């Protein structure tokens, strides 16, 4: 029987957000996310708690996604899910649920690479947002990843630069923890940075060859900076918080932009798309807009709802793979370390 419309259910469970979305022929009908606030008390994601919460959330989240979309499970053409990379326990919940649902409905199962989904989120149809033409450079920046990817086609991607230690999102969160900010600290640093002087304090940028990144040295430098200044003035952080946040953000954005400029120079590709949780940062968005005007780049910034982990990005990859008849078997397994 021919389907008039192609409905894809996307499931995302790579870290601490349980998400489900329904897409129809490239257009998102629903995008539901259940956040796990319990991790705030620990200053970071606790893997065991995350997987337990996914088990509690996944059925109601999928139910809500179908309900909001006005679609019954029998109308689904396929189930797409995040196979990796991510936290193994979290991935297992989403993978097991997706496999069971696809088997029960006797419909195709589609595995999705989480990092690929952050890039292809730009192809979700949303009013007011343009889609990049191939080839383009994608910079995926999040709490767990920092990469520059040369994208020649939907499924022809090559990582040309990545972090050799910590991810950029971790640099934001660990710096925020040193300043006494809550988790995740990135949004709070971004908010305070707008009120401070970005050149109040100087932090040395790490020197890394090629297009690779490093943030562990910067985190250590910030730690020593805080220790040194609070030793002489216990109120140093309180008195200078906005300036410290602005200076940290200015340094991190400088590192990202320096590598992007180098990537554009080497590849001769000046179409730039960003993705991942840190792409919500107002500073990096502003820096890209400046580069667009000053350097002639064409930049693509995702809608805020598609920056953090979400199932809409999984669904769009599922749809593109469905069109290619690119399905996976019930024998597939979750993989914590999955290469792009």
Language model features with spans:
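N-terminal beta-alpha supersecondary unit
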Residues: 5-85, 114
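A contiguous, well-structured pocket-lining segment that forms one wall/lid of small-molecule binding clefts
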Residues: 191-272, 281-295, 322-325
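Glycine-rich phosphate-binding loop plus the immediately following alpha-helix
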Residues: 152-195, 219-220, 224-230
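Glycine-rich phosphate-binding/hydrolytic loop that grips phosphoryl groups
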Residues: 118-119, 302-340
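Short Gly/Thr/Asp-enriched flexible loops that form oxyanion-binding sites at enzyme active sites
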Residues: 81-106, 124-125, 282-290
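Conserved phosphate-binding catalytic cores of ATP/NTP-utilizing and phosphoryl-transfer enzymes
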Residues: 1-4, 112-136, 317
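Short beta-strand scaffold segments in enzyme catalytic cores
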Residues: 18-23, 138-140, 146-150
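Conserved phosphate-binding/catalytic loops in two-lobed NTP-binding clefts
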Residues: 111-112, 272, 289-314
């Amino acid at each position: 029987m021919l389907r008039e419309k192609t409905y894809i259910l996307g499931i995302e469970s790579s870290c601490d957000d349980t998400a489900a979305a329904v897409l129809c022929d490239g257009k998102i009908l629903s995008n539901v996310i259940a956040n796990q606030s319990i991790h705030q008390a620990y200053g970071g994601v606790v893997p065991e708690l995350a997987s337990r919460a996914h088990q509690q959330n996944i059925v109601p989240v999928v139910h809500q996604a179908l309900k909001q979309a006005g679609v019954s499970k029998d109308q689904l053409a396929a189930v797409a899910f995040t196979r990796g990379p991510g936290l193994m326990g979290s991935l297992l919940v989403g993978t097991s649920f997706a496999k069971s649902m696809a088997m029960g409905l006797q419909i195709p199962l589609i595995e999705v690479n989480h990092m690929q989904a952050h890039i292809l989120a730009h192809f979700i149809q949303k009013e007011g947002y343009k889609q990049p033409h191939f080839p383009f450079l994608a910079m995926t920046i999040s709490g767990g990843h920092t990469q520059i990817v040369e994208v020649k086609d939907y499924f022809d991607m090559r990582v040309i630069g990545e972090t050799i230690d910590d991810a950029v999102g971790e640099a934001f969160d660990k710096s925020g923890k040193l300043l006494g900010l809550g988790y995740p600290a990135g949004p709070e640093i971004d908010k305070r940075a707008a009120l401070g002087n970005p050149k109040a304090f100087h932090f040395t940028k790490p020197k890394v060859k090629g297009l690779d990144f490093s943030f562990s040295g910067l985190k250590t430098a910030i730690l020593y900076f805080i220790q040194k200044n609070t030793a002489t003035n216990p109120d140093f952080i309180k008195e200078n918080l906005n300036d410290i946040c602005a200076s940290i953000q200015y340094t991190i954005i400088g590192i990202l932009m320096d590598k992007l400029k180098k990537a554009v120079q080497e590849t001769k590709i000046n179409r730039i798309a960003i993705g991942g949780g840190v792409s919500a940062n107002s500073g990096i968005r502003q820096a890209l807009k400046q580069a667009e005007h000053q350097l002639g780049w064409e930049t693509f910034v995702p809608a805020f709802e598609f920056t953090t982990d979400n199932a809409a990005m999984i669904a769009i990859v599922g749809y593109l793979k469905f069109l290619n008849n690119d399905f996976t078997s019930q024998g597939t397994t979750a993989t914590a370390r999955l290469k792009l």
